[in-house]
């Protein structure tokens, strides 16, 4: 902390009180993760700008044992990325996780990051979601993936990626040997041909590393789901599939349900905010009751599912004990549905923390109230966000590669 103040004084940069506070709290000397985010829930904090990053990097250059740097929700621009690149290029760098989500990084910043990562052997996780790097920035990242063979997690949601960069990234994923978690949600796709789905299918057929794939807000239709299902049928590594906020209806779900009957690896599926309706829920229910289905957690919130479809899902839970988490809020909650979920909860078949509804009775009638539980956003944490099942699954693959 004192060194940080001295550096600020040397370069005549105003001291950032938030940085000082975090450095004061950091006493560990090994496996250090610095969390300097700009979105504190309880009180306002001074967000970091490029000058703050320059001063911080000056301090971190001499600090050993830094493995994580969480800088999301700040005001870092392409200029700040130049300083962070110096940290990544440091000869004895131990930084394995870098979170820059929701800053002000654009195409040039993405290019600088990619240049620094081409020779980097320690960074395992890069989160850039919410930075408008655009189509060209996505192309730089796709090129980087062809040369970097150590990165394991890449988040690029809400980055304004175009169809060219989406396809280029998916093609790079076909041959990448370590990348097992990718988020490409909400690109800017103006084509309705869903070419990306064809390439994604080809990638899933040959990729035996991918564990978690986020494809939310892709504009996916039933045709896209049909193509995706072709790849899922032959894939044996994917555990988590996120296709929320798309345009999938009962016809698309039918293709997915056929895959689930045979796929022994898919455990978590997010179908929130689609339009599968009652027929789609029935297709899912049939798949869940099959012995070959391995789905443990399912979200179908806001899908216009009426009583018959929801009852089919509750019956599937009774028949198959594999499914332990289900999220259904935002659908039609007729009283038979309310009673069915009350029975699941009261019998212990469905735990209260594993669903987003709670039953209550008024004047002899059963109703459901919303409970603020939701499907976990990452495979590596359980529904409480504490149990690192992802690490235990991947074992040594999550350990940093030694610097060369």
Residue ranges of model-derived segments:
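Leucine-rich tandem repeat or coiled-coil scaffolds
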Residues: 1-404
């Amino acid at each position: 902390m004192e060194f940080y103040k001295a550096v600020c004084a040397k370069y005549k940069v105003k001291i950032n009180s938030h940085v000082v506070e975090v450095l004061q709290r950091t006493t560990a000397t090994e496996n250090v993760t610095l969390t300097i985010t700009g979105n504190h829930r309880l009180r306002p904090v001074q967000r970091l700008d490029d000058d703050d990053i320059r001063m911080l990097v000056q301090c971190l250059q001499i600090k050993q044992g830094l493995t994580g740097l969480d800088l999301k929700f700040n005001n870092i621009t392409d200029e700040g990325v130049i300083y962070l690149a110096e940290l990544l290029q440091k000869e004895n760098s131990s930084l394995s996780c870098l979170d820059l989500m929701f800053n002000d990084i654009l195409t040039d910043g993405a290019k600088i990051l990619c240049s620094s990562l081409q020779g980097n052997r320690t960074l395992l996780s890069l989160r850039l979601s919410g930075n408008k790097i655009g189509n060209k920035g996505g192309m730089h990242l796709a090129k980087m993936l062809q040369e970097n063979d150590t990165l394991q997690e890449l988040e690029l949601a809400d980055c304004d990626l175009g169809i060219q960069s989406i396809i280029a990234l998916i093609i790079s994923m076909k041959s990448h040997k370590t990348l097992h978690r990718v988020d490409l949600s909400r690109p800017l796709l103006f084509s309705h041909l869903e070419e990306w789905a064809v390439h994604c299918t080809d990638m899933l057929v040959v990729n035996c590393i991918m564990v978690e794939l986020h494809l939310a807000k892709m504009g996916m239709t039933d045709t896209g789901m049909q193509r995706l299902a072709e790849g899922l049928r032959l894939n044996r590594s994917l555990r988590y599939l996120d296709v929320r906020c798309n345009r999938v209806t009962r016809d698309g779900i039918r293709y997915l349900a056929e895959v689930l009957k045979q796929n022994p690896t898919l455990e978590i599926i997010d179908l929130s905010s689609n339009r599968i309706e009652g027929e789609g829920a029935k297709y899912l229910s049939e798949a869940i009751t099959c012995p070959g289905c391995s789905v443990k957690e399912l979200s179908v919130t806001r899908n216009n599912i009426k009583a018959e479809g929801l009852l089919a899902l509750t019956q599937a839970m009774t028949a198959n004990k594999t499914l332990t988490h289900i999220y259904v809020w935002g659908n039609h909650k007729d009283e038979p549905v309310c009673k069915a979920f009350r029975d699941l909860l009261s019998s212990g078949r469905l735990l209260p923390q594993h669903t987003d509804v709670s039953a209550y009775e008024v004047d002899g009638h059963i109703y459901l109230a919303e409970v603020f539980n939701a499907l976990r956003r990452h495979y590596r944490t359980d529904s409480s966000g504490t149990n690192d099942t992802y690490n235990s699954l991947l074992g040594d693959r999550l350990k940093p590669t030694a610097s060369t």
